[in-house]
């Protein structure tokens, strides 16, 4: 347990002294992050984003988007959750340039701190650096950096949910490529190499805030899972592995973009490193989603030994 926490503290893209706590799943890691942020700030509000996926426990489901698939019939949900749209460059208004669109998203973020909740009542802003379930959408660097600035200015804890991105984007953490240092980061999935383990890593002064007994669990950080995670982290951060990840990412992206040029059904190819997605649309002008086509493609791929999954708000 201690050896894994020390390793995570070493590699996490967080400024200053760090501490970690282990748990069983990404959802539990996110729950811990919110509890710790609330303990540290003595505030309750949490700002999250449309398209976000943070888990399926009650609190993390409250933070999660895509109502019909994940949330239908499971309310009421946790209070003090505030949600605004996240940047989605592929579907930006056509009159905007890329930079103008990011400006508009930042303006929307700043407006939320007047129209929805005062910054003095916000404990945390939680965001996936690459939104996974929303459709592998990398957040614009400038948008993340503005979140960082606002959190620093108002004493808000910035939480990066890297449960899905950890080890999958060409760097150990996606934040490393997107130019931002969060206060707290959550990791799971690839961390355990198939075994159930997750971690919440953060600035030491924040992690020390909860009272004794406030955060923990019986099975968090089992010896077997810790051994697997230590080996996984060391493999994932090795220069040879990262070089291969970068190579595969470039290869996949170039091949998928070539396919896009020959198939009007492919509206967009996007992601970060080898964490890539193809969005299927009925029409490239209207960008009308094509979920039935996506399901048909997936079934054919699975039948031929290639495992794919659907993602995105429209499952396309």
Which role fits each region the language model picked out?
Residues 1-316:
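Conserved N-terminal phosphate-binding loop of PLP-dependent enzymes in the Aspartate aminotransferase
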């Amino acid at each position: 347990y201690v050896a894994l926490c020390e390793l995570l503290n070493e590699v996490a893209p967080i400024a200053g002294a760090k501490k970690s706590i282990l748990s069983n799943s990404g959802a539990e890691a996110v729950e811990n992050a919110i509890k710790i942020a609330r303990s540290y700030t003595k505030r309750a509000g949490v700002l999250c984003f449309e398209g976000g996926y943070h888990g399926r426990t009650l609190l993390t489901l409250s933070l999660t988007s895509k109502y019909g698939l994940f949330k239908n019939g499971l309310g009421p949900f946790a209070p003090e959750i505030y949600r605004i749209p996240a940047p989605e460059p592929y579907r930006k208004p056509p009159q905007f340039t890329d930079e103008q669109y990011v400006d508009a998203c930042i303006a929307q973020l700043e407006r939320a701190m007047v129209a929805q909740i005062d910054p003095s009542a916000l404990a945390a802003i939680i965001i996936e650096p690459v939104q996974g379930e929303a459709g592998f959408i990398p957040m614009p660097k400038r948008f993340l950096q503005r979140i960082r600035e606002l959190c620093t200015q108002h004493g808000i804890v910035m939480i990066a949910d890297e449960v899905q991105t950890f080890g999958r984007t060409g760097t150990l953490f996606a934040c490393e490529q997107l130019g931002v240092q969060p206060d707290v980061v959550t990791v799971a999935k690839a961390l355990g190499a198939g075994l159930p383990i997750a971690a919440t890593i953060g600035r030491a002064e924040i992690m020390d805030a909860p009272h004794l007994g406030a955060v923990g669990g019986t099975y968090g950080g089992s010896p077997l899972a810790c051994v697997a995670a230590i080996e996984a982290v060391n493999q994932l951060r090795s220069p040879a592995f990262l070089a291969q990840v970068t190579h595969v990412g470039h290869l996949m992206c170039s091949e998928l973009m070539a396919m896009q040029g020959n198939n009007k059904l492919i509206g967009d190819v996007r992601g970060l490193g080898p964490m890539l997605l193809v969005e299927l649309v009925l029409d490239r002008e209207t960008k009308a989603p094509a979920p039935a086509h996506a399901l048909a493609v997936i079934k054919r791929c699975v039948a031929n030994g290639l495992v794919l999954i659907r993602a995105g708000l429209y499952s396309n």
